[in-house]
């Protein structure tokens, strides 16, 4: 077998293996609403836990969805950049509602925007959890379901950041 044909077979195998284990992938964009709708869907369909790392968090809709998930028995933890502790954010609102919230001030900015949901799903992208991201900015969201390996990697990073935060 020629080396080029072997290389093609290896590439096809890698692509198939990667796709077969990727889980189900959804995506959305803003403006237009599909990004925020996907975030709300990921929260509303959670059953066990949501760990959210947020650079900027002012979206009332997302905060209310998290509180509704908490009422359903979903464990919620929020990790926010230290600037998110200022007024006009929902960090204080969530903390006052009993959500485990920590603020990270170990970096110039903690610029993450991701959720680990039920230890097997990941939502990430450029979308800050804000009204501006939904209505005024060009943003993206990707939601990967049923990918425990990916979720595990994001979970480890969340735990590292959460432990070093106040």
Language model: regions and residue ranges:
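Primarily the HKD phosphodiesterase
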Residues: 41-99
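Bacterial N-terminal signal peptides
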Residues: 9-18
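Boundary at the C-terminal end of the N-terminal hydrophobic targeting segment
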Residues: 20-24
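Structural recognition of the beta-strand scaffold that forms the well-ordered cores
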Residues: 51-53, 77-80, 102-103, 115-116, ...
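Signature of lipid phosphatidyltransferase scaffolds
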Residues: 122-166
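Bacterial N-terminal signal peptides that target proteins for export
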Residues: 1-10
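Solvent-exposed loop/turn segments at secondary-structure junctions
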Residues: 56-60, 82-86, 106-109, 121-122, ...
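A general structural motif
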Residues: 30-35, 59
């Amino acid at each position: 077998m020629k080396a080029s044909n072997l290389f093609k077979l290896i590439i096809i195998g890698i692509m198939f293996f990667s796709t077969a284990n990727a889980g189900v992938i959804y995506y959305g964009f803003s403006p237009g609403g599909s990004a925020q709708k996907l975030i709300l869907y990921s929260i509303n369909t959670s059953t066990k836990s949501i760990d959210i790392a947020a650079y900027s968090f002012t979206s009332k809709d997302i905060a209310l969805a998290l509180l509704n998930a908490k009422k359903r028995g979903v464990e919620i933890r929020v990790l926010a950049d230290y600037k998110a502790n200022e007024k006009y954010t929902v960090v204080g609102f969530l903390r006052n509602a009993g959500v485990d919230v920590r603020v990270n001030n170990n970096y110039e900015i903690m610029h993450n925007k991701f959720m680990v949901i039920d230890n097997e799903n990941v939502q990430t992208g450029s979308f800050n959890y804000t009204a501006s991201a939904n209505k005024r900015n060009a943003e993206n969201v990707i939601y990967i379901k049923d990918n425990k390996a990916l979720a595990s990697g994001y979970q480890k990073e969340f735990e590292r950041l959460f432990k070093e935060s106040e």
